[in-house]
Amino acid sequence: MIIKKNNFRKILVAFCIGTFLCTGCHNKQNITQLESYDGKEQVSEAKEESRREYKYLAKTTVKNGDAEVRLFIPSESERVAASQSKATLHGVTINNELLKTAESPKQISKKRLKEEKDVLASKKKIQNIVSDKGSGNEKTFLFSLSYDITKKDTIYPCMEIIRAEKVTPEYVLKTIITVDNRYTDKESNSLLQEISAAYGINLQN
């Protein structure tokens, strides 16, 4: 008998603009898209903390060349490299990478989507791989991807969000958020709400 678990199966992913703090660059974008500064307009720690108080997320920094981005990941973090940060908590994984590239956010996220679909398709216990058409603009673009994992006669609907944001003219922040329903629990929904606020992704159950 096959049992299908429906936790977070009907999450709707809508595009909205998030905010990250970028240092070490001279980028003058609209503040609703990116809050950047070059040392002349410092954002105080107190001000930053007052705007970003999370239960499950902690601050981290990714660096590449002269670009540095401060962002939030689950508190149980795993440092991969200076330009990357990765963390998993309550069945939700966030993987960030700061890339120096001439490619657009749409190109980067689309390429990553194809790679991920190819990997998933090669695994026997993964089925029903479906992605949306993507949404965004020249500065930020994202795709959502859903699939089912079968384990011991139970089907676990899972999903990924692939997001890319141009944080300076030369650098793009690539973010992959994975929800693995084999490991989600009663805390997962609250964690996803915080991720929604921190990354500018509207997640609706």
Give each language-model segment a name.
Residues P169-N181:
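Short, well-ordered beta-strand elements
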Residues V80-Y171:
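Conserved polar/disulfide-associated segments of primarily extracytoplasmic proteins
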Residues C25-Q84, V179-N205:
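N-terminal targeting sequences that direct proteins away from the cytosol to non-cytosolic compartments
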